[in-house]
Amino acid sequence: QQLLDLVDAILATPTETVKQRSGAAVVFRAKRYIHQHLGDQQLDSAAVAAAAHVSVKHLQRLFRAEDSGVMRYVWQVRLQHAHRLLSESNGQAASVQEIAWRCGFATAAHFSRAFRACYAMSPSHVQVPRLR
C-alpha cells in the first residue's frame, strides 16, 4: 500500500525537478537554435520561441531565471562569435563589414557600436591584419 501511495503522489503533481529539467530542455533548444541562426538578421524572440515550441512569454521567463534575456543572449553570442572571427590568425581575415553581416548585424556601424560597448575597443583593433 505504501508503494502505491508513493506512486500516486509522484504521478499526481510534477516534481520541481521535472519542471526544472523541462525548463532546461527548452532553454537548451532555444540556445541551440540561436547558435545555428546567428547570421539571420531576423532572429528574434518570436523565432526562437517557435523553434523551442513555447510561447515568447514563457521563453523570456526561462531566460530571466538564468539572469539573462533572449535577445541579450543573442547579442552576447553574436558579439563573442564576431570577436572570435576578428581574432582568427589565418591571414585570411574578412572585413569588419563582412563579419558584421555573418554575425547578424544589419550594418557595420551598428556592429561597431555594439562591439565597442561590449569590449571597450573597436573591431578593427582586434582584427588580425590581412596578408598581402
Positions of predicted regions on the chain:
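An amphipathic alpha-helical interaction segment
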Residues: Q1-V18
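Short amphipathic alpha-helical elements of helix-turn-helix/winged-helix folds
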Residues: I10, Y33-H37, L85
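N-terminal positioning helix adjacent to the helix-turn-helix/winged-helix DNA-binding module
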Residues: T15, K19-A30, W75-R78
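DNA-binding recognition helix and immediately preceding turn/loop
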Residues: V26-M71, G91-A106
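Alpha-helical DNA-contacting segments of helix-turn-helix folds
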Residues: F63-H81, L85-L86, A114-R132
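Sequence-specific DNA-binding recognition helix
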Residues: S89-P129
